[in-house]
């Protein structure tokens, strides 16, 4: 290799011959990727930044342009499976913003293909398991419920011993003298299970829509849980979803007073959710060992969607057809005005 050749490379006049590149990499003791300045794997912080940048872009920029940018990033880092996974999560949270049903369907197929790519090539078993769940959500978005069930039922049998793994791990930590690890893991698991119960209960309210006794008992028990653990302060989004579903249910049961009560509680949760410009998950005085774990999540403590994006959904929430039953109620009108003030 002559000095003249190197000079031309440095000035971008010409490129090294392909056969020369591995020789140069060996000479300098680096990989070919390092020699070319190509980084096929991104760090957690880099992935998080890309996610947040694109999430904000969905809120303020052209949808099609943002999707094209995401596709370009995925092509460039196709073997960075955590990045590909997060881009699927991002698209799943925003694909309904596409202007036509055809574009939405195309995005669902694209996400499904990316999930298949991760599952086929990634060596990280935990990421592959998460990708299977993500693929099931994508299939459900496209109305492929039977296919989603085939994925989910295989991993959700309540009879399996794996359901006991959390408590067994805490016991193992204690027996090994790792009290700090036992405490950390117990808190994290309790926190996750609490919100899993609240979220599943919101789903159960839709199942119990024909059984008011079961509906009432579910609301009563979950409300007690919300109050005891001060869950509105911990995760206002999960609580708001539950209260909203309770309000809709009581409208179906023609109980306007109960519906208004839970609509008010729904707005209390929304007010907490919107109180900060960038709502973040966090612990409290009781869950005082989980903040570090939250920051280690793929997207840290921040919301998976930009504020402007989910505010649009909130703005339309009291326009559900069931709320027509309350359109002449003065209390409901005041609640509508409160919602408008919150999102302006």
Model regions: which residues?
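Recognition helix of helix-turn-helix/homeodomain-like DNA-binding domains
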Residues: 1-16, 37-41
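Alpha-helical repeat scaffolds
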Residues: 65-74, 102-121, 143-157, 179-192, ...
């Amino acid at each position: 290799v002559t000095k003249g050749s190197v000079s031309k490379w440095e000035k971008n006049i010409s490129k090294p011959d392909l056969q020369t590149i591995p020789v140069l990499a060996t000479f300098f003791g680096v990989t070919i990727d390092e020699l070319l300045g190509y980084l096929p794997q991104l760090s957690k912080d880099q992935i998080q930044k890309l996610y947040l940048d694109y999430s904000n872009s969905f809120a303020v920029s052209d949808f099609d342009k943002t999707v094209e940018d995401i596709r370009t990033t995925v092509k460039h880092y196709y073997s960075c499976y955590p990045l590909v996974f997060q881009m699927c999560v991002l698209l799943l949270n925003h694909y309904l913003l596409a202007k036509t049903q055809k574009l939405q369907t195309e995005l669902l197929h694209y996400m499904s293909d990316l999930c298949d790519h991760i599952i086929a090539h990634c060596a990280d078993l935990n990421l592959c398991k998460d990708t299977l769940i993500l693929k099931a959500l994508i299939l459900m978005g496209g109305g492929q419920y039977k296919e989603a069930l085939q994925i989910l039922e295989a991993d959700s049998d309540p009879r399996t011993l794996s359901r006991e793994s959390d408590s067994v791990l805490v016991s193992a930590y204690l027996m090994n003298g790792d009290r700090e690890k036992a405490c950390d893991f117990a808190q994290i698991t309790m926190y996750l299970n609490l919100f899993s119960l609240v979220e599943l209960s919101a789903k159960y309210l839709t199942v119990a829509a024909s059984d008011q006794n079961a509906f009432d008992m579910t609301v009563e028990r979950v409300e007690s849980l919300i109050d005891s653990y001060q869950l509105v302060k911990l995760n206002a989004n999960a609580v708001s979803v539950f209260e909203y579903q309770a309000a809709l249910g009581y409208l179906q049961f023609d109980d306007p007073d109960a519906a208004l009560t839970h609509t008010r509680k729904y707005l209390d949760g929304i007010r907490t959710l919107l109180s900060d410009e960038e709502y973040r998950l966090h612990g409290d005085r009781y869950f005082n060992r989980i903040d570090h774990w939250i920051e280690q999540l793929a997207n840290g403590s921040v919301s998976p969607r930009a504020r402007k994006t989910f505010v649009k959904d909130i703005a339309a929430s009291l326009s559900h057809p069931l709320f027509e039953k309350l359109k002449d109620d003065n209390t409901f009108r005041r609640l509508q005005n409160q919602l408008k003030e919150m999102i302006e």
